[in-house]
């Protein structure tokens, strides 16, 4: 989903919420654009978050700054401590809620050995292939 897709969906259908993936939609700026547009149409945002602590921290910053947050999706490994060794200070929970990181930037700092432990790999484009009518195909 991109900003334009989100706009078309909100304007042309009766949706209650959108689930943008902040890492594939274009980051925090694009995510905020979608959230603000959705807010103007009484649509909630539920950020899709299947990735690691950087994605989670970015989503939490967006969640803290929009009035139309529905709920924040968390990947399972976020709950079992697997992400903790990726960052210097693990994301924290209190009373069943994830706390918004308050450090500079998005609130986290990668562990010194994160690049060595989790080397980057090239990924293909996440852009969906479209049929002549705009429908997603081969997804």
Where is each model-derived feature located?
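Shared catalytic-loop signature of beta/alpha-barrel
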Residues: 4-104
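Extended hydrophobic packing segments that form well-structured cores
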Residues: 106-139
């Amino acid at each position: 989903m991109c900003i334009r897709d989100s706009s078309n969906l909100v304007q042309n259908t009766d949706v209650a919420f959108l689930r943008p993936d902040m890492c594939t939609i274009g980051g925090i700026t694009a995510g905020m654009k979608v959230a603000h547009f959705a807010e103007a149409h009484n649509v909630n945002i539920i950020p899709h978050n299947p990735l690691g602590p950087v994605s989670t921290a970015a989503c939490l910053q967006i969640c803290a700054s929009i009035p139309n947050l529905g709920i924040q999706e968390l990947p399972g490994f976020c709950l079992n401590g697997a992400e903790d060794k990726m960052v210097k200070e693990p994301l924290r929970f209190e009373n069943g809620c994830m706390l918004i990181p308050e450090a500079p930037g998005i609130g986290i700092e990668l562990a010194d050995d994160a690049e060595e432990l989790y080397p980057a790999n090239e990924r293909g484009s996440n852009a969906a292939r479209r049929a002549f009518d705009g429908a997603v195909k081969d997804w």
